[in-house]
From Swiss-Prot:
Protein name: Small cysteine-rich protein 1
Functional note: Induces neurotoxic symptoms on zebrafish. Has also been claimed to be implied in calcification, but tests on homolog proteins suggest that proteins of this family have a neurotoxic function and not a calcification function.
Keyword annotations of the record: Cleavage on pair of basic residues, Disulfide bond, Nematocyst, Neurotoxin, Secreted, Signal, Toxin
Keyword field contains Secreted: yes
Amino acid sequence: MDVRFRLCLFLVILVIVANANVIKEPEKRFHPNLWRPPRCDWPHGVCSYIRDRCAPDTPFPCGPIFACPLPTNKCCCRRPYLPPWAGRR
């Protein structure tokens, strides 16, 4: 009985220690140096070729805020956006 209890306690402690980094991840998610832009997709905007103008229904270029999967594309948004760390004015 004592061996089973110690083994169970050891496994519980092992799981807690192994998941310690997972618990800290949400703090890192919005750090400006580690932030990755989300995909430029509906409802935010559309990806178009870099040298083309943005369409009339998506007039705002928002490249640093949203990313397109291809490096030859840029993101055109329906309204202007600010990155999460820029703060609202």
